Amino acid sequence: MSKPVDHVKRPMNAFMVWSRAQRRKMAQENPKMHNSEISKRLGAEWKLLTESEKRPFIDEAKRLRAMHMKEHPDYKYRPRRKPKTLLKKDKFAFPVPYGLGGVADAEHPALKAGAGLHAGAGGGLVPESLLANPEKAAAAAAAAAARVFFPQSAAAAAAAAAAAAAGSPYSLLDLGSKMAEISSSSSGLPYASSLGYPTAGAGAFHGAAAAAAAAAAAAGGHTHSHPSPGNPGYMIPCNCSAWPSPGLQPPLAYILLPGMGKPQLDPYPAAYAAAL
């Protein structure tokens, strides 16, 4: 595309006046050097010049500017408009509850694993071995959930328990008891208001949510969990005894299992109602 005829060039500054001859000389000495590299070297050499060495070029630039203003009194510099870059939006394929923004911002690898499982349920990214064996899929999802929500020590123990229980025919029933044996190494861990898991692959992710509930109970020092009367999918961690006591504590967290709708939240399970 040819430039318009009435285009007026900007007046040269002191560096441009000095670099005219220097650029031509350097291009002759280095014919294969790119123009950007030549400009970079010329800029470094210009900074090394003293004020007395720059003075003649500064005076010449002032003279050229005065001549330019006399020839083009209505001249106005109009820079080229650069296209605005589109802002990139953060996309999370794995549902992250409130209070875990730092984990999402840090691009936690376990979140990427959860995103892969979530996308694979509908897009075929999950290996066929995991689809054929829901026990192994449950163990893998439980380990990924433990790495996100619990410290490294508790997460390692949870992953080991899930892997050990995956080979047993009663793994889903025995996984909670194995997870309860983990020592409470992170008693100060805050609970999220709700933990949302993907609804695809109910058999595999049911075991994952059960493992996460057991890990939450072990981390917080709870002895067992109660199912909510309104929906058995809600597991409430609790450390109440068989006999009623005045120091009963309210539930600390609700864990939503896949395939269950969100009912009216019941703050106290049937055990509390019977005790009262």
UniProtKB/Swiss-Prot annotation:
One of its GO terms (cellular component) is chromatin. Transmembrane segments: none annotated. The keyword Zinc-finger does not apply. Keywords: Activator, DNA-binding, Nucleus, Transcription, Transcription regulation. Gene3D superfamilies: High mobility group box domain. It is found in: Nucleus. May play a role as an activator of transcription of OPRM1. Overexpression of SOX21 can up-regulate the OPRM1 distal promoter activity in mor-expressing neuronal cells. May play a role in ameloblast differentiation. This is Transcription factor SOX-21. It comes from Homo sapiens (Human). The gene is SOX21.
